[in-house]
Each structure stands twice: as structure tokens, then as C-alpha cells.
Amino acid sequence: MNTIRRLFLLVAIVFYGNTLLPQSSAYQKLSLIMTDLETGETFVNKNGDQLLTPASITKLITTATALEILGDDFTFKTTVQIDGILENGIVRGNLIIKAGGDPLLGSHYLENTNFLSTWSSILKTIGIKHIEGDIVADVSVFDNNPMPKGWCAPDLGNYYAAGVYGLSFCNNMLQVTFKSGKTGTRPKIVGISPQIYGMKIDNRLIAKRGAGDCASFVGEPYSNIRKAIGYIEANKKNFTIKADIGNPPMALLGALRDTLLRNGITQSGTLRMDVEDVPSIERIRYPLFIYYSMKLPDIVKLTNYHSNNMIAEHIFKYLSLQKAKQGNFKDAIEVVKEYWYSKGLDVSKLDIYDGSGLTKDNKFSAEFLNRMLIYMAKTSKHSDTFFNSLPVAGVSGTVRNLLRNTSLSGKAYLKSGSMSGVQCYAGYIVRDSKKYSMVVMVNDFRGNRHKTVQKIEKMILHEINQYEQQ
């Protein structure tokens, strides 16, 4: 009977693999693997060893590695310092923001986004009335390369490709609001948030009836110029599109100086950024206070629930500090690979270049990710934290529409990953007393994404139901 069941499953897998996508998608690639976490039986393994583009399920590797290495109590730390004496309310030197890689300073995900007012109040309480020197962003925690290898030029300038900086601000995201007129006219900029001194929007947008949002931004790292291109819907009073902030450290310093002035603290010097740990004129620094982020489990949940590239990349780059003095992507890759190699996973099936999955250069096997999911569920002391970071299919996050109105709605805890020609899901399925790990990766499909997702849903349901009916 068991042999018959396995033969049936093999036929079913081949059938679903060949009919997963519409007829126009003849060149699609599929991997599917499912494991019963109680028995350890991998009851489905369709092409599990092939290397495919994962898109955002890469974030599972980043967040799991961070939990394992950094731990539940980890927080990012930003230290506010001075390098001169405080005399009669005057700082005889510079005010320095020693960055710690925190991606959430001013984040809209937080209840209190006005952290600069908190900083200003503390400085005023200390007795500071005037700063003779500069306000400095010490961003030496990371190198000065904010973009991972493989990020495409057309993505740069857009909010989802925000760079990785030692000092970040407002999710490194700029919201630009336009007012559009009739078709063929150029929309007017009516709002920019946050306000950034020296920021310039080169507006090349055109209003077009029926366009919806066909707009994007173009811009280079460390530049305050963002070009808006494409089309937006005609005759809209408020139409907001998102760009990245080209120079977050300097944007934060500008906002801090404005906040200090409103609080009665003046400054004589300039704003500047140091990428080296020691300023050009070495002076002793005196810490005034440390500003802590939320703890890592909450950051991991934000990352996986919202599939936020910017947060994932900051976590990823921070991991490199396990072996490097300055955060960088090359060492981050090595740290991730070395960790999972130490746990017995085959890292020859792991080829990554970023921590979010934005680059198409990333490739790994469903088997590798499934093995990691099994480890996190059965061995890791961070099992519950990792599991609870995943959105629920049919209910929340990026999978709120997946498996809705099916027997697995509310019972599949999955991270999604999608880009052109790519649709992936990975995580856990919990039904009654059974718990499964699951990875499905589809590459090179053509045509309708919605139909592709429907086929994936049917395949998942079929394999789970078939296994439980044995």
C-alpha cells in the first residue's frame, strides 16, 4: 500500500509540475518540497536540489541567521557624543551621532516617530544651549557602498531599493505627493515628506487617464536629486509615490539641526559625514546618551511581515561585523554561509548577494531553505520567535490573499517572494496536530501571475490532503 501511495504521489507531482502554469509558460521551472516535522519524512521533493531565484523568501535566511547569531535581546545602538568640553551651556567642539546601523530611526512602523525631539530634549536637559563645532554623522559602522551586488539600475532611486547606510532616516523613504490635471499635462508637486534641505525632484511625470501608478524614480546614492518618470492618473488632487532618500545621514542631520533650533539650541558649524572611525583631527569623544532600537524579534517580525527590503539589508550588513571591523556585503555573505555550514547544511546550494532578495543574482535550492526551516523549527532556541514573525496565509501581510477560503486559510505561516517571472512561498503549515515545513519556488513563468498563484495553491492543498489521507 505504501509503495502504491508513493507511486501515486510521484504521478501527482509530475502532473502538477507539468500543469502548474498556463500553456504560455512552457519554460517555467518548479521546485517543491514538504516535510512532516514530527516524523521527519520529506513526502514531496520535486526538483528540490535545483538552484532558483528566490526573491523575498531570501529574507527568511537573513532573519533566521540574525536571530541565531545576535539573539533575542539584540538592539541597534546609536550613540550621541561630543568631542569637546561643555562649558556654560556651550559645547566647545562637535556634536557627533555615532551610528550603529539602526534601520528604524524615524520609521513609520513605530508608534513614536519623533525621536529627534527626544534627542533634543535630552540635550537641553543636559544643559546644552549652543554647539560651536559641527554636527557630525559618524557612519563608520558600515562601508560607503550602500547597494548590494546585482541591484538593477532602474530600481535605484525607488523606495524598495533604498540603500544601506550606517545612519538611516524614516526608512530611507521619501513620499512625494502630486496634483495631476488633464491627460498630457505635467503634475505639480504639492508635498514632500520628510522635508529634506537641498532635496530636488526633477519632475518628468505626465498625467494620463487610466494610467494608475506607472511612475518611478531614478537617482544615485548620496545624491539629493531624484528624477520622477512615467505616468500617473489624471485629475487627482493627491497622488503620492515613493522614492528613496539619497543621503539619509545628511537628511537626518538636517532634521536634527532644525529640531535643535526649535528647542533653543543653536550651532555655529556645518553638517558633515565621517565614514572613518577617527575624525581628521583626533579628539577624545564623550558619550552623552545611547538611543536603543526595539529588540531584534520585533525587527524580524517587521521584516518578514512587511517584506521590507531596507530593514532586511541593514540586518544582513550588520551580520558582517561578526568578522569585519566595518560592515560590508562581502563579509555578510560569508557569515551567513559559515553559520549554516556549521549546522550541517549544504551551502553549495546557497548563492546569495543580498539579504532581501531584490537581486536576481541570488540563487538557492528549495532543499537548502527547507533544511533551514526544519532546523529553526526543531533545534533553534529561537523557534517561536522565528515562527511568529511569519504572516498568516489568508489573513495577514503579503500572503493575506493566499489560500483564502480554503482549508489552509489561517493555518499556513508563509513568506512570499515575487518579481518578474518569479513566485515563491516558504514557511510552515499547521493543521490540527500536524506541522509541516514547505518551500515552493517557481521561476521563468510567463503570463498571468494570479493564475500562477492559483495553481500553486491547488498544488499545496493537493499534496497536504493526499499525505494526510494515507
What are the residue ranges of the model-derived segments?
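Bacterial Sec-dependent N-terminal signal peptides
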Residues: 1-25
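A short, well-structured edge-of-sheet supersecondary motif
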Residues: 24-46, 272-273
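Short glycine-rich loop/turn motifs
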Residues: 29-32, 300, 312, 423-426
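Residue-level preference for non-acidic, small/hydrophobic
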Residues: 40, 57-66, 135, 167, ...
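Small-residue-rich helix-loop
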Residues: 42-45, 114, 306, 313-470
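Short active-site loop at a secondary-structure junction
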Residues: 45-65, 69
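A short glycine/serine-rich beta->alpha loop
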Residues: 46-52, 242-243, 358-359
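Conserved serine DD-peptidase/penicillin-binding transpeptidase domain
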Residues: 69-347, 462-463, 467-469
